[in-house]
Amino acid sequence: MVKGGDYLTRLLCDIETYSAADLPSVGVYRYTDDPSFEIILLSYKIDDADVETVDLTEQSIPEWFLDALTDPEYVKEAWNAQFERVSFTRILRRLKRLGPDEWLDPRQWRDTMVQAMELGLPASLKQAANYLGVDQVKDPRGVRLIRYFSTPTKPTVKQPESKRNMPADAPEDWELYKSYNAQDVRTEAAISDKLAAIKTQAHEWDLWAMDQRINDRGVAVDVPLADGAIHIMEHANAINMAHLKTVTGLDNPNSLMQLKQWLRDQGTPMEKLGKALVQEALDSGKLPPMVADALETRLKLSNSSTKKYLMMEDARCADGKVHGLLQFYGASRTGRWAGRLLQVQNLPRNYLPDLDLARSLVKAQDAEAIDLLYGDVPDVLKQLIRTGLTASPGHRLVVCDFSAIEARVIAWYAGEEWTLDAFRTHGKIYEATASQMFNIPMDRIDKQTRQKGKVATLALGYQGSVGALKAMGALNMGLTEDELPELVDKWRNANKHIVRFWYDCQRAVETVLSGGGVVRLQKGLMFYKRKGFLFIKLPSGRRLAYAKPRLEQQPDGRSHITYDGQGDKVGFMRLDTYGGKIVENIVQATARDLLADAMLRLEAGGYPVIMHIHDEAVADVPDGFGCATLCVRQSRGPRACR
């Protein structure tokens, strides 16, 4: 590995660990922060040498390895490198090789999983190895061995206290575990070598390092608020469960089987009890009073939003913060971030008139006063979740977001000048859209017409039709089903350049897949195929990747664009795409690049970002820092987009 003419040693590594904390539930930062955390096996590979394994239940981590962790001459590489980097950080802190607030520098690390995800490949080591057909596959015995050696046993009647299985308890399995650990390094190395021909941009590694720093900083938790909310929630749940038992006469109303049978007995059978369906049934006003009472109570019990307070407590580290809330390249194809743990990108909004009063009542655990003033205790708790994430002492949170970023980006790509003019001037995109659609002057757009412009703007930009309008809630906005086809036609007639952009992108992909070569479109977009991937190069220089793309003849005689990718459910599968969907990927990926570059500028300017939500950056700054400078820095577009 060479950088700037100097040779850098490549150090591939993989570890097996033990902690009493549950990794999937609390994340790697809290998992490694637990006092019981240990690294029990270490396997590594230097450049092209053989894999070495160190049994850390018998030996210590070699001194040279500890030195290498902070030596920039070694490039550390792992699959999901955040796990190794955070784990080794905890160990180096214990050894006083790092300060209590220091983290291993992510700029010295490379993550093979990120390389795979950038190419639209599986995020699972096993799945990626199988898909790529590398000769070193992941050892399938790992799940059982991890469960045995790396997690505490679950309490049973015979063994009421959990215990830890040690190597001496199963020496043969321990030898298998060491072999499994070593094989993971071989598999990771094989994947890394396979992907080396398609290099990840240096700028993307800068962004990954920034992402790691954001996760390292963490977000402070308002502990009294979380504690108060949990107390109120548990008390309310006990009351609601007792009430539900009284209404239904069931021993266990949580049992779907029992509750469905009870509903059938009441003459109101419901085969599915999802939140949306239950709410729809309640809104219909056709349910018998007792059934409505039972279902309303069940909704209160199933309020998953308030469970986020429990996550704040469970995932909080000793520094009072929750770390690891965002995953880099979590969305394949676009490269957008994905939420983890608290899912900060999906927190309920708040519209309470007096947040400070509501917060003080929750901290005082005064459910009676909350009920008296607001009437709906679970709803108040739900609305206050956002306020449970706070600034550090002596700091405040400052926020800036990109307004209607996708509408701006798609108009910029397509050259839809009237939309761009609206953003350059008054910024009222919904009114401007309605004006274009219905040929009505802006100053005569009423509330109902604006609503049509709004739902059309939000739903139709990516070749959506009537179904997209319905999914966006058009029928709940006062529109009738008969109006929807006309709304689609009017929007497309008003946005001819965007419509043309859909078909230009589709033709570009079809041309590349059928005849090869390179197709260039406006704003520097470039479509080409290389090493079994379709690539779309963005103005930022980043490439969107689609694995094993091809044109497939459908029964209707038309060609469809297909590729291998992650479906909505677990597993890699064959997926279809089309012009509007390709445009959606391009637009969302470009919006991601704009936010990513903005966060680099904010960090460089003394605004350390601690989290970001969709197109909004949140920085934790000392009291006295203003928002104006942050907004100026964030709004300064990259050179490629000027």
Where are these regions (language model features)?
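Generic long, charged, amphipathic alpha-helical segments
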Residues: I429-Q448, Q554-I610
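Conserved "right-hand" nucleotidyltransferase catalytic core of DNA-directed polymerases
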Residues: V2-T17, A21-L23, D34-S36, L41-S43, ...
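A short acidic-Thr-Gly-centered motif at the start of a beta-strand
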Residues: M1-T9, L66-T70, V380-R396, L600-A604
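Active-site palm subdomain of RNA-directed nucleic acid polymerases
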Residues: L195-L207, L594-A617
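Conserved RNase H-like, two-metal-ion catalytic cores of nucleic-acid enzymes
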Residues: M1-A123, L352-L355, R359, A411-Y413
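Conserved catalytic palm subdomain of right-hand nucleotidyl-transferase polymerases, strongest
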Residues: L12-C13, W79, W109-D111, A391-I405
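A common structural junction motif
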Residues: M477, Q634-C641
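Short, conserved charged micro-motifs
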Residues: G624-V632
